[in-house]
Amino acid sequence: MMTSTRALVAGFLLALSSPALTTALAAQEAPATTVAADPAAPVWAFEESDVPVDESFIFGRLDNGMRYIIRRNATPEGTALVRMRIGSGSLAETEDERGLAHYLEHMAFNGSKGIPEGEMVKLLEREGLAFGADTNASTGFESITYMLNLPRNDSTLLDTALTLMRETASELTIAPDAVDRERGVVLAERRDRAGFQQRNFEDNVAFLAPGARYAERLPIGTIASLEGATAQHIRGLYERTYVPANTVLVVVGDYPVEQVEAAIRARFASWTPAPVPTEPVTGPIDITRKGLTDIHLDPALAEEVTLSRFSAWRDEPDTVANRDAALARRIGYGIVNRRLARLARGEDAPFRGASFGTGELFEAARITSLTISSADGEWEKGMRAAVREVNEALTHGFTRAELDEQLANLRTAFENAAKGAETRSHGAFVNAALALASDDRVPTTPEWQLAQFERIAPELTPEAVWQAVREDAAPLAEPLIRFEGRTAPAGGAEALRSAFAAAMALPIAAPADNGPLAFGYGDFGSPGEVVSDT
């Protein structure tokens, strides 16, 4: 099942019809702007949610608008993690800034007012802090995150870490000569990523999202924009997006929260407030897009066919009711995918693997997809089997035994999480904090999650989870069909569409319902006799 808003972006991108496309493109090339933060707006998502926040987190906001999240944790003991999330990524770039959010990430390690160029890496090494590609920073569509893993929990190292983050926040020098020296590194990184996976992604974008803004704002940028980047260009993006109200600092580790909070205030209170950047355009989007076919070939690609349809995005804030609904959908998709997995593991399996699910694309649209991976030349066999299985599930529903299996697996997962609540790693808490910052997902305790599951589980029926999936999934009629692999399918696009039509026409039948699952070992034979107890 696909659920993550951001995880789907690389796989599925959208487009609009020509009239809307013209309007949206005109809008997206308007000058970048900022807006004043609304002081009356909620600071955190849990302020407007009935989902109870984990009170072991400490949440705060400085007068300049910067927010912070602190959590004391001793797993592993004597260590800590520090993260600084800037709430703008490559989507915030203008046309001539493409790739500069990532370029700016590089410049964070090339000199600031308090740490001269070349000294930051030495400082990291002296303090035993890890340094390397993707170790200290990461740039995405919607954010840039700076990362430091502290191997000790002394106050000096905490101060050093916060100093590095504070310098990055507003004190970078972005000197022209330093920009020129780093250009080769950035271009080399882009070349290194320009392999078959990148080509496959770009073809997918061109098929699903011609002209969509986020299809044209890959974080790695373009050769032309990177070669032409100047210190002035980079500084313009820096000053527009690195502002207190657009920043969340997270510290999780073996420190007293009072110490961390005081250190944050001491370092960041002087950061001058500024308007937050406006939300960037992510579309244009046409959720009626259908009936098109794409074939992408590369010697390095395994054979795979994806059938997709779009639907409208739904605003579903994090509430108890919405979590209940999401659980029902999760179980329903889990049953469908369990059936597909059983086919993949069977004798003379029709495909290597298949998955069915629905997820969000930013706040722009939703996409339902059935993806089938097959041995070379076996795509038609795989498509027929997978489409038939999904149609059967969506037409006739699920059995009690299938529901019980999903509930049992989920119960075990929730129980194990609750049992291990006191030994959760720093990373688990950091991920929860960043999910609140990025997706307004309220961090909760494992004990509460288990209690909520036990509350709703008795109310779930095969009919309920079936209807949840039927209402959530976009019908795969006239889907967008994308083929990728080493060898073109015989008959090309017409054969793909004909095979899909034939698969949709296959007869289907309701599965046998053998009732609730029962323990498989009910007869243990006659009791034995104790012959020795020594």
For each predicted feature, which ranges?
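Proteolytic maturation boundary segments
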Residues: 26-70, 256-341, 345, 404-408, ...
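Generic recognition of stable, solvent-exposed alpha-helical segments in well-folded globular domains
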Residues: 99, 115, 119, 156-160, ...
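Active-site-adjacent, His/Asp/Glu-enriched structural segments that form or flank metal-binding
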Residues: 76-77, 86-101, 106-199, 225-228, ...
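N-terminal secretory signal peptides that target proteins for export/translocation
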Residues: 1-5
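Structured mid-domain segments that build the active-site/substrate or prosthetic-cofactor binding neighborhood
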Residues: 305, 312-315, 321-400
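Bacterial N-terminal signal peptides
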Residues: 9-20
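Scaffold signal of the M16-like zinc-metallopeptidase fold and its non-catalytic homologs
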Residues: 32-42, 110-115, 133, 137, ...
